[in-house]
Amino acid sequence: MDREIFRRGLMLVLSSPSGAGKTSISRELLRREPGLTMSISATTRPRRPGETDGHDYFFVDATEFGLMINRDEFLEHAKVFGNYYGTPRGYVEETLQKGQDVLFDIDWQGTQQIRERLPADLVTVFIL
């Protein structure tokens, strides 16, 4: 009798100081690992030419972002250079439930927030 074993996905968080190469490493991991999905952040910053909502970011206004914080919809969030950024919990949970691993390219403060909110499925790598 063949039984398929379901594995819940893992969160792989790469964090580093600016310029240490985490984005380059993330791109290479995504290229090599077909089961790996990049986390998509929500942001209040304006959309840049060529960016797609739901692919590059989830673009929301500041009011909606604040409501999302109040509803505890983020695994992590921060204000950076006047704009808000955050990782929507629902998107990540849905992806993990499908058995897909989720890659995060975030700073160490975001990593700490995720560790506090969802520690069981978390693998962290700090790049120097």
Regions found by a protein language model. Name each.
Residues 1-12, 34:
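Extreme N-terminal, non-catalytic leader segments
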Residues 5, 31, 49-52, 94-97, ...:
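Conserved catalytic network of the ASCE P-loop NTPase/AAA+ motor domain
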Residues 15, 42, 128:
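Alpha/beta-hydrolase-fold catalytic nucleophile elbow
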Residues 16, 21:
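Conserved glycine(s) of the Walker
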Residues 56, 75-82:
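Flexible beta-alpha connector loops of hexameric P-loop NTPases
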Residues 63-73, 87-128:
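ATP-dependent NMP and nucleoside kinases share a basic, alpha-helical "lid"
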